[in-house]
Amino acid sequence: DLLPYCEAIVSVWNLLGRRDNKYKARIKITVHEHGIDDIRARVEERFARIRPLFTGVDQALLAEITQAFAPPAYAETSLAAYDAARAANPAFRSWSDTNLSAHKNPDYAIVSVSLKKQGATPGDASADQMRVLADLAERFGHDELRISHEQNVILPHVAKGDLPDVYQALRAADLATANIGLISDIIACPGMDYCALATARSIPIAQQIAVRFDALKLEHDVGPLKIKISGCINACGHHHVGHIGILGLDRAGVENYQVTLGGDGTEDAAIGERAGPGFSAEEILPAVERLVLGYLDLRSDPEETFLQAFRRLGMEPFKAVLYPDKEDKRDAA
């Protein structure tokens, strides 16, 4: 039922979606304008008509796609070089702790190459760096690399024995930033610097946050924290599912940044809750710093992540650190 139901949703959106205004050519705008009940009724009616006509996916096409994504031929590999590098090189150990993910073959790893060096434009790579990545994919990655929605590059099949060489090549190309999943691994849309739809800048905000927390040397102490920044309501930066989401808006010609908390884009999906009034471009970095430092005080132990603490405590303790002036006025009253 899933595929025809998805087709029904797309068909209804195609029928009702706005074509007169590029700013409103989004399914969420259609749902907002027509209401979820009307959209649901239309989808169910369309699904009832097309479901009997669906006889299943084209098996030949499915087999062709499956073959295109077949796993490579894994070679047996020694882990000695990897284990020795972890023992002898703290920088390699830190990188492997953050930038490697488990592979279904225990002798291999999934390498996430961070394009989020502190102070750089999130997701940017130079032509020379792209050539290095292509060479690494050819030499060590079975000719495969992927671009993640988190604006990083993935080498999905790297033998652990080759990881020290991969790391050294990445380091030489200034691509060995060890921050995957940490504060400075920020998703940010192009914002007003490059996008005609944007109402606020995103890239400078991401750069300021990354530089600040690198200077504070708190990233690894804070642990997993997803900050996502969008420069307009189209939400290309996925701010609504950030642990800390930042939405840039235009308030009477002045950039204003709305903060949401508690979003999650994983299997425990949640839309972030708006914390309160927005902040100016000058205020948003101190606001994020207050949030993160407040979390360190609020968490039950060093293992409790920002998202876990938010789910345990709710919005109010975080709002108190985000808006200290309001709390001071409340105490004075």
Model-derived segments and spans:
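Peripheral terminal and linker regions in Fe-S/redox and tRNA-modifying enzymes
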Residues: D1-A333
